[in-house]
Design a protein with these regions (language model features):
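Conserved alpha-helical scaffold segments that buttress catalytic/binding sites
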Residues: 2-243
Length: 243
């Protein structure tokens, strides 16, 4: 910290906020996941981690409730160029598959693009397994792992690590969508399926609290009502209570 000036110009040193901490020194590690291969309406979230890193040096560090906020030891490794390249390649093929669904339906699209769908699902499984292992290592080292995506599907590996590390935990989801669809568009780990997968796979998940949901299917509403772990605060109810 002797060379870090919280009142000076942010230095683009490769770490988030230009902070001077290494991973070994950090209490919190941000894991960038440049992935949006299942995004069904518009791409670009895979660029999010790098964009956030690039903009982070523009921030100031005064906080009314946290004295000397800049002493929070946070580290962010470089965005994986390998996974960004894999994502971009699969996105191009996946877009053709998604476009065909919107014209001819899911069954017809899968008959033509089945190999593409399988490749994306397999790559996603590998990504999730890699992320889980990375998060497990950080948890065992006494650090707090955070995922910086990327589409909504990306944190599942982190959630699996938490599930393996704790006897019980909860998820707070602030979102417009419930993400409770089962393999949306055939993607086993779709951005629209992460909370469905969490409820299905995580044995120690005790509560899923959803806040601000405003765009949801009837089947998702039914699942939300039937699973006692799910507590959904719909946007329309919050608005009615506020006004």
């Amino acid at each position: 910290m002797s060379t870090f000036d919280p009142n000076g110009v942010g230095i683009a040193n490769g770490n988030i906020f230009g902070f001077p901490y290494t991973e070994a020194e950090a209490d919190i590690v941000l894991i960038p996941v440049p992935w949006d291969a299942t995004a069904s309406y518009g791409k670009g979230t895979s660029n999010g981690p790098q964009a956030i890193l690039d903009a982070s040096t523009q921030l100031d560090f005064y906080h009314p409730a946290l004295d000397r906020a800049y002493e929070t030891k946070i580290f962010m490794p470089a965005v994986s160029s390998e996974w960004k390249e894999i994502n971009d390649r699969l996105c191009e093929a996946g877009q053709q598959y998604i476009a065909h669904i919107e014209v001819a339906g899911e069954e017809a699209a899968q008959s033509i693009y089945g190999a593409t769908l399988s490749e994306i699902n397999e790559a996603h499984n590998t990504l999730r397994a890699n992320l889980k292992e990375r998060c497990m290592q950080l948890l065992q080292a006494g650090k707090i792992p955070c995922v910086l995506g990327g589409e909504h599907s990306t944190p599942l590996g982190l959630l699996q690590a938490l599930d393996a590390n704790y006897d019980g935990f909860g998820i707070l989801q602030i979102d417009a969508h419930a993400d409770l669809r089962d393999a949306y568009e055939g993607f086993e780990q779709s951005h629209a399926s992460i909370m469905f997968n969490a409820l299905k796979e995580l044995k120690n998940l005790q509560k899923l609290t959803q806040v601000g949901i405003r765009d949801i299917s009837e089947k998702e509403v039914q699942l939300s009502a039937q699973d006692p772990r799910v507590h959904t605060f719909y946007d329309w109810d919050l608005k009615n209570a506020a006004y």
